[in-house]
């Protein structure tokens, strides 16, 4: 699948910090701490991405994570306020079930998945985490699922049928 790069400078991106993890390296003189930040960015209009950053200070780790997230933007196909069809996103041991929901349902998702879906602009969706609940695996599984979504027009074109034939 060929992904064309999305230019972040043309979008009004909002950032959300998902987690900050403190890691320690034990040396002769004591512990040396470093920080790893996980950030999700999106324009609430069908574009979302995530990034990680590591540094000796929290603000620097967050800045690096935001930069990384802007490089990894994907486009999310939407039908109204929800997604076109049900899909399971998989990454490592993390599986995320994403189901379209009727208008007014809201975002039913936990933690990191909620951040991704809200910043992508999906207003009505059901999701369930199956397997690993590690934030990075959940986010990657969600983005993998969202990137594989296809609109009815795309599926019809691939099958060589009309949208009416496809939808019955």
UniProtKB/Swiss-Prot annotation:
Gene3D superfamilies: 3.30.160.20, 3.30.230.10. SUPFAM superfamilies: dsRNA-binding domain-like, Ribosomal protein S5 domain 2-like. GO terms for molecular function: rRNA binding; structural constituent of ribosome. PROSITE patterns: RIBOSOMAL_S5 (PS00585), S5_DSRBD (PS50881). Keywords: Ribonucleoprotein, Ribosomal protein, RNA-binding, rRNA-binding. The keyword Aminoacyl-tRNA synthetase does not apply. Pfam families: Ribosomal_S5 (PF00333), Ribosomal_S5_C (PF03719). Residues 13-76 form the S5 DRBM domain. Disulfide bonds: none annotated. InterPro entries: Ribosomal_Su5_D2-typ_SF, Ribosomal_uS5, Ribosomal_uS5_bac-type, Ribosomal_uS5_C, Ribosomal_uS5_N, Ribosomal_uS5_N_CS, Ribsml_uS5_D2-typ_fold_subgr. With S4 and S12 plays an important role in translational accuracy. Located at the back of the 30S subunit body where it stabilizes the conformation of the head with respect to the body. Part of the 30S ribosomal subunit. Contacts proteins S4 and S8. PANTHER family: MITOCHONDRIAL RIBOSOMAL PROTEIN S5. Belongs to the universal ribosomal protein uS5 family. NCBIfam families: rpsE_bact. The N-terminal domain interacts with the head of the 30S subunit; the C-terminal domain interacts with the body and contacts protein S4. The interaction surface between S4 and S5 is involved in control of translational fidelity. This is Small ribosomal subunit protein uS5.
């Amino acid at each position: 699948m060929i992904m064309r790069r999305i230019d972040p400078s043309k979008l009004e991106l909002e950032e959300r910090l998902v987690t900050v993890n403190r890691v320690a390296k034990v040396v002769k003189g004591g512990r040396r701490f470093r920080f790893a930040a996980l950030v999700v960015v999106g324009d609430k209009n069908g574009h979302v991405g995530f990034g990680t950053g590591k540094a000796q200070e929290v603000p620097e780790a967050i800045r690096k994570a935001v930069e990384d997230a802007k490089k990894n933007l994907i486009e999310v196909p939407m039908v109204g306020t929800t997604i076109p069809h049900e899909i399971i996103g998989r990454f490592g041991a993390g599986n995320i079930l994403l189901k379209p929901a009727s208008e007014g349902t809201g975002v039913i998702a936990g933690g990191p998945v909620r951040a991704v879906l809200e910043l992508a602009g999906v207003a009505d969706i059901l999701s369930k985490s199956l397997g690993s609940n590690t934030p990075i695996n959940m986010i990657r599984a969600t983005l993998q699922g969202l990137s594989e979504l296809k609109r009815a027009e795309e599926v019809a074109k691939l099958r060589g049928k009309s949208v009416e034939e496809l939808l019955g």
